[in-house]
Amino acid sequence: MRKRVPDAGLSLVVAVVLLLITMPAGSLASPPAAQESQGLFVPVPAPQGEAPEIAAQPAVIRSRLVEVDLSLLAGSSPRRLALNLFDDVVLDVDLQEAEPLPDAGQAWRGRIEGEELSQVVLVRRGDLLAGDVFLPGAVYRVRSTGGGLHAVSQIDQSALPPEMEPVPVPVPPAPVDQPHDVTAQAPADDGSIIDVLVVYTPAARQAAGSTAAMLAEIDLAVADANVSYENSLVSQRLHLVRAVEVSYVESGSVSGSPGDLQYLQGSSDPYLNNVHSLRDSYGADAVVLIVHYPSPVYCGVAYQLAENVEAGFAPYAFAVVELTCATSNLTFGHELGHNMGANHDWFVNVSLDRHSYSHGYFNTQDRWRTMMSYNDV
């Protein structure tokens, strides 16, 4: 059942996520050495182990192809794992108990030993693994490339496009008071579970490599956001109600007059109108469209909840996310943060229309940021 999208609590959630470390890769320090243990990744010798199409991506510092020893992820109990990302980056990770996902999938979360400000999220879907590794000074990504192989990449977030400024919504007319029987109303839920419908384009699925890889990316995006809430001791969680491919070709702009966001939100144009019926069928609070542009200008955009539109915001709880940025740049959680009323960091947005805690934050000295901040540390 669709709920009214909360504002203050979620603004706080997104704004105080201090444990998602997303520093520029240029500040990479020597990572802690792993103990002697079997690594998750099995190197693939050249030339099969080379992935020039991945290495050519602007935000990729380096990459290599590997096989994944999935036997190390059998079961769901907590464990220690060696992430041998590269020859010079081998990390001991303490994983908590895996969370079950649909279709027998699993989501693992953990931290690197000796790095308090680190985060590891791994999602398994059959023989596919998708993962993000954040630690002070570096971001790493693991994605399937098909044929039983996976690419391990080091990501330079500063080379990714910026997030677009959120789109304000029209102020609705004041509601007219109507007599009603309060006792007859169903009790409202506490708002701690945010139901999200994710739709994606054929271009996004093709860029991901397959439908299974696309679904793993979506699972990872949700898991990344939920781990950030957990790290901040916030009880709220995202719940993926459905992930569906839609027949839609990117308009050329994630937002404009109109753009992808406006086509997603609108119900009177000829585009994406089935999304509204899907939203109603699955009771989604918010809807995210994942797109892919060969040379994206922005990582994403969303409508922003404002204090004067809280009661009438449901028709605007929509966001558009570029696949390239969805997880490694935390854009999925970032754009949903705008739906929840959060702003960019104070250096980008000085608006006081929400709460003092509903802005992104970055630490210039230690070079880390929260998900609502720009990559300007």
Task: Label every model-predicted segment.
Residues E36-P47, A51, A151-N308:
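Fold-level signature of zinc-dependent metallopeptidase catalytic domains
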Residues I112, F134, V198-A203, V241-V244, ...:
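Active-site-proximal beta-strand/loop segments in catalytic clefts of secreted hydrolases
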Residues R79, W108, L129, I194, ...:
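Residue-level detector of short, conserved catalytic/binding motifs and their immediate flanks
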Residues E97-A98, V121-D127, P136-S153, G209, ...:
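Surface-exposed flexible segments
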Residues G126, G191, G283, A314, ...:
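Short, solvent-exposed loop/turn segments at the edges of secondary structure
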Residues V244-Q262, G312-V377:
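The catalytic-center signature of Zn2+-dependent metalloproteases
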Residues M1-A8:
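N-terminal secretory signal peptides that target proteins for export/translocation
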Residues L10-L20, G26-G146, G266-S267:
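N-terminal prosegments of processed precursors
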